[in-house]
């Protein structure tokens, strides 16, 4: 069986490895990024994920990547679309053009391929494109992967959602069940609109938890209370749970900001209060944190890491970047220095980058860190962070 994975991000790569572990499958990765293609063909992971990196060490010739669409789609049985769908602030909608471009190629080259969409899409999207392209062989199956743990979450999924109740949906469900490691996983077959809803509502619930515990922390800070003690007491209730409860500067990253905004857009003309509040509370929190930082009146403020979470290899839509922008908006004269080893340039957002940590620590009188790590221990008296449990969960 030949399976094409379109998009070499953490979702695409995790799915590629999942299917390639079965020797009956031929897996081809398709992307336009020649650096990622070269990395995979040289048996190196283009993303940071311990299990994925381990796979490349142990399975030298399992995966092949290409930018040649004809080569990729020739004789393929399935295509998994895992291309980015960023949120367009002007349109108030996901930018789904990458998916449609893939579907155009598939229809022109090999229209018999069964298409599985893993990219996050608006509610109602799958039905729309099936009509637009006159293709009945398109199924939406959302992913619930964490960046940094994408392969583990693919092998041991919390559940499998298939947005199709037909024979094709059952075939795709069996395809995943045959390749995952977890036994007795729940699999749900439903309408595509419902599967799309599961994805957006799931991430919006997680964003709601982040927002809730951030507001607990905001209250505690204003009243000089210990937020860690309060949160521990709240979370000890099994109905609430001891997860996703660590305060932060706000939620960021690739999924939660865009998915909450898309769900709110899907609520157009539907009475709602909570969904809107989840989006708003994140901006309120970032502004609140910015004011707390400015109240400390630092002469030189250090920004420790731009990454969205601990051990990430990127800072796409990172909350700390929003904090920087608010700082510059509220006080244009504030002097900032960034420590971020991932940035090789001397400046970022027109701010000096200092990647000698000792020099960085000596130059600044206050350091802000969305997440605290061991590197900061020796200068912890200089650090301002909302992180009370030292975890991303």
UniProtKB/Swiss-Prot annotation:
One GO MF term attached to the UniProt entry: NAD binding
Keyword terms, alphabetized: Capsule biogenesis/degradation, NAD, Oxidoreductase
Sites where the protein binds substrate: 143-147, 199, 203, 244-248, 252, 309
Ligand binding (NAD(+)): 11, 31, 36, 85, 120, 147, 254, 258, 316
InterPro entries in UniProt: 6-PGluconate_DH-like_C_sf, 6PGD_dom2, NAD(P)-bd_dom_sf, UDP-Glc/GDP-Man, UDP-Glc/GDP-Man_DH_C, UDP-Glc/GDP-Man_DH_C_sf, UDP-Glc/GDP-Man_DH_dimer, UDP-Glc/GDP-Man_DH_N
Catalytic activity: UDP-alpha-D-glucose + 2 NAD(+) + H2O = UDP-alpha-D-glucuronate + 2 NADH + 3 H(+)
Function field: Catalyzes the formation of UDP-glucuronic acid which is required for capsular polysaccharide synthesis. Does not catalyze the formation of glucuronamide moiety of the capsular polysaccharide.
Designated name of the protein: UDP-glucose 6-dehydrogenase
């Amino acid at each position: 069986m030949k399976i094409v994975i379109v998009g070499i991000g953490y979702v695409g790569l995790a799915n590629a490895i999942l299917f390639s572990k079965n020797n009956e499958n031929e897996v081809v990765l398709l992307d336009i990024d020649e650096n990622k293609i070269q990395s995979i063909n040289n048996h190196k992971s283009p993303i940071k994920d311990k299990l994925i990196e381990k796979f490349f060490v142990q399975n030298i010739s399992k995966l092949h990547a290409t930018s040649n669409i004809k080569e990729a789609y020739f004789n393929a049985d399935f295509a998994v679309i895992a291309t980015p769908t960023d949120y367009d602030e002007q349109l108030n909608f996901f930018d789904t053009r990458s998916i449609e471009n893939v579907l155009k190629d598939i229809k022109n080259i090999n229209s018999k391929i069964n298409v599985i969409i893993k990219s996050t899409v608006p509610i109602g999207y799958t039905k729309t494109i099936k009509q637009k392209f006159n293709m009945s062989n398109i199924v939406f199956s959302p992913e619930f992967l964490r960046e940094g743990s994408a392969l583990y979450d693919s092998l041991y999924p919390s559940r499998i959602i298939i947005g199709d109740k037909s024979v094709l949906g059952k075939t795709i469900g069996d395809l995943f069940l045959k390749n995952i490691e977890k036994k007795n996983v729940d699999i749900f077959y439903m309408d595509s609109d419902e599967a799309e809803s599961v994805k957006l509502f799931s991430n919006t619930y997680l964003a709601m938890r982040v927002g809730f515990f951030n507001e607990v922390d905001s209250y505690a800070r204003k009243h000089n209370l210990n937020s860690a003690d309060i949160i521990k007491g709240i979370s000890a209730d099994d109905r609430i749970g001891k997860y996703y409860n660590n305060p932060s500067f706000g939620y960021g990253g690739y999924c939660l900001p865009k998915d909450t905004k898309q769900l709110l857009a899907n609520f157009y003309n539907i009475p709602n209060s909570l969904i809107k509040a989840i989006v708003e509370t994140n901006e309120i929190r970032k502004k609140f944190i910015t004011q707390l930082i400015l109240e400390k009146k630092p002469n030189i403020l250090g920004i420790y890491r731009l990454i969205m979470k601990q051990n990430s290899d990127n800072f796409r839509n990172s909350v700390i970047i929003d904090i920087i922008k608010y700082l510059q908006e509220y006080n244009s004269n504030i002097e900032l220095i960034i420590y971020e080893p991932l940035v090789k340039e001397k400046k970022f957002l027109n701010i000096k980058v200092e990647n000698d940590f000792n020099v960085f620590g000596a130059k600044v009188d206050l350091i802000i860190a969305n997440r605290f790590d061991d590197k900061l221990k020796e200068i912890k008296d200089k650090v301002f962070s909302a992180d009370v449990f030292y975890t991303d969960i």
